[in-house]
Each structure stands twice: as C-alpha cells, then as structure tokens.
Amino acid sequence: MRELDAQLALPLNREAQLPVEIERAALLGALDRQGEAQAAFIDILRRHPTHFSALNEFGTLLAAHGSIDAACRVYAEAILHHPDNPMAHVNLGNLLLRANRHGEARTHYEAALKADPDHAAAHQGMGAVLSDEGNRDGAREHFAKGFRGHAVSTLPYRGNGPPIPLLQLVSSGGGNIPTAPFLDDCVFLTSVVVADYLDPATPLPPHRLIFNAIGDPDLCEPALEAAIRLTAHSKVPVINDPSAVMRSGRIDNAAR
C-alpha cells in the first residue's frame, strides 16, 4: 500500500495515475477495508464513469462482499460501454448462474464466446449452465475447453496473519460440497483443483492440507477417480477421503 501511495504522490498527470488508483482501491478491498475501497472506486468512477477496469474491479469488490445486486448493476454498466469485452459478460453471467437465472447467464456466456471463442471462463460457465440443465454431453464439451490448462485457481486470502495453504478438490460438473461456510478465507489460502481436468504434469500449489469437496459419487465418478490418484501419495492430511466417498454411492449402498 505504501508503494502505491508513493506512486500517487509523484507529480504525474491523473490519467497516468489511473491504473495505480484502481490497483490501490482493489487492494483496499483485499485488505477488507470495504468502506475505503468503495469510496475510492466511487471517486474514480465519478471522474471516469465508463472506464472498464474500474467498473470491473468495483463489481468484483461488491460481489466479494455479498452486494450481488449492486455488482450486477456495475457489470451491466461495464457491458453497456464495452459490449465486446468478454470479462464483464462472464462476471455478470457467473452471478446470474449463482442466482439460478440460467437463461440470462447463458446469454452472457454466449456473448463472451462470440467476442472470444477460446475464453476459458466463458466455457466453464456455459458448461455449468448446460450441466444444470441436464445436457451432460454439451457440458463436457465446454468443460474440456474451459478447464484444460486452467484446472487450478487460487482464491483471495483476506486474513492478516500467515495463512494455512489448502488444496480443495472439486468436480467440474457439480456434486460438490459447499465449503464457504467453514473454509474461512481469513484462515486458509485455498487453491481450487478441478480434479477431472487436472493434467498430472501440472505442479500443484504449496499446501499443508487437502479438502476433498467432491461429494456425489454417482455424478462425479471421473473426478473422484482423479482425486483418489492425486491423494494416493500425498504426505499431508486429507479431509473427506475420496476413496471413502466413492464407496458411498447408491449402488454400493444398495449392495450393503
């Protein structure tokens, strides 16, 4: 933060300082200084009301703190002024998908893919829409394009002290345990691994704990098989062993 403040104190024109202002506002949000971050973004947008990065980062801040309706409005404003930028379409689509507004989400993912046919996050979102609608073949096609080479992502850490690095295993097509209520982002630095699309050659982020969030063996067999292989040689504790989850399917339960 001090480095950004020092850059803003330099005698540069305001246009040249704008990216630094946006970075500083986003950092305030990451530090959980919500009020200051929001005020900083509002000040920037008062001067630059159509600036894409400012709108997009402000929408991301609002969504991260649960102001979903406000975030949707900000993303929609970004789309209004930048209709061919796929990122705002994807961000708005993701929020609409969370609200089970699948038709509207699909429209935005389609717009993103029209602008950029290889956009990984748009393929991931479209796959989720199709999966929820029961179109497994269509979902797999989009998931393959969206997650191959993009199977590992890291969530923001909002704590003050050193985090506990954690690996969270998930399935691409749903059937995952909701973890937000207990994987505190002020305690854990969480790297999410989409197990069924992880290239074995991809190095895993540093971690001291693995949490398997894949919970439906009937829906997620390929992901569980990949999770079993991934954890077989792990030297760190594994919570919710994928081998045990695999044995809890309807067929296994019926056999017992």
Predicted features and spans:
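Helix-start (N-cap) detector for alpha-helical repeat units in TPR-like alpha-solenoids
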Residues: 18-19, 52-53, 86-87, 120-121
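Short coil turns that delineate tetratricopeptide repeat
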Residues: 12-15, 49, 83, 117, ...
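Conserved N-proximal alpha/beta basic substrate-recognition cap immediately N-terminal to
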Residues: 152-165, 170-256
